[in-house]
UniProtKB/Swiss-Prot annotation:
The keyword NAD does not apply. Monomer. The gene is lolB. Belongs to the LolB family. A lipid is attached at residue 21 (S-diacylglycerol cysteine). GO terms for cellular component: cell outer membrane. CDD domains: LolB (cd16326). Plays a critical role in the incorporation of lipoproteins in the outer membrane after they are released by the LolA protein. This is Outer-membrane lipoprotein LolB. Keywords: Cell outer membrane, Chaperone, Lipoprotein, Membrane, Palmitate, Protein transport, Signal, Transport. The keyword Hydrolase does not apply. It comes from Cupriavidus taiwanensis (strain DSM 17343 / BCRC 17206 / CCUG 44338 / CIP 107171 / LMG 19424 / R1). Gene3D superfamilies: Lipoprotein localisation LolA/LolB/LppX (2.50.20.10). It is found in: Cell outer membrane.
Length: 203
């Protein structure tokens, strides 16, 4: 499929995603954790995958908000349409789509794949966005000359840290955080690759 057609099919062939730019309010609230630290990331994503035996692709922007083990992920097309809102908490996960009832499950990855044709590894991204492996799960990692993660194989995914960036910290030296992350899942007949480019952080 050529690039222009991929852009025309940004909404993955799901008719509900081709409707007008409607905002999607999350139907699941964060579990209460008043002492948990909060962090937000914004950036761009692109995904290439196989659906019904055909190569497909989607791209857009994302907003990631986390508070402790609570996560909200918004996916938005280049035209400003909300593709999906994912909310994952210790008590469960919800996928909200435009003009559709909420979909609930213990984990959101399967819901995303069924509805959108691809799934971002939300559980792993809680740690991978911070440049670290998920604790309690087997992993193989390599590091660059500066001691930063270069590659990580964990939970069926290969994670490549392509670029890093400084993030300012008031009253302290800047720390290095990922700038670009490439993820690949080899699932036999349903491979999936995802590229994340993370916006610079502000103090």
């Amino acid at each position: 499929m050529n690039r222009s057609r991929r852009l025309a099919l940004l909404c993955l062939g799901v008719p509900l995603l081709l409707q007008a730019c409607a905002s999607v309010a999350p139907s699941r609230s964060f579990d209460v954790d008043q002492d948990a630290a909060s962090r937000q990331y914004t950036g761009r994503f692109s995904a290439n995958y196989v659906r019904y035996g055909r190569d497909e692709g989607v791209q857009g922007s994302f907003r990631w908000e986390e508070q402790g083990r609570n996560v909200r992920l918004d996916l938005v097309s280049p035209l400003g349409q909300t593709l999906a809102v994912v909310t994952a908490t210790p008590s469960g996960a919800t996928l909200d789509l435009p003009n559709q009832p909420p979909r609930n499950a213990p984990e959101v990855d399967t819901l995303m794949e069924e509805a959108l044709g691809f799934a971002l590894p939300v559980a792993g991204m809680r740690d991978w966005l911070h440049g670290r492996a998920t604790q309690g799960s087997p992993a193989r990692a390599t590091r660059d000359e500066q001691g930063r993660l270069a590659t990580l194989a964990q939970n069926g995914w290969t994670v490549r840290y392509v670029a890093w960036q400084d993030t300012p910290a008031p009253g302290a030296a800047a720390t290095q955080v990922p700038r670009r992350i490439d993820l690949a899942r080899d699932a036999g007949s349903n491979p999936l690759s995802v590229r994340l480019v993370i916006d610079p952080q502000t103090p």
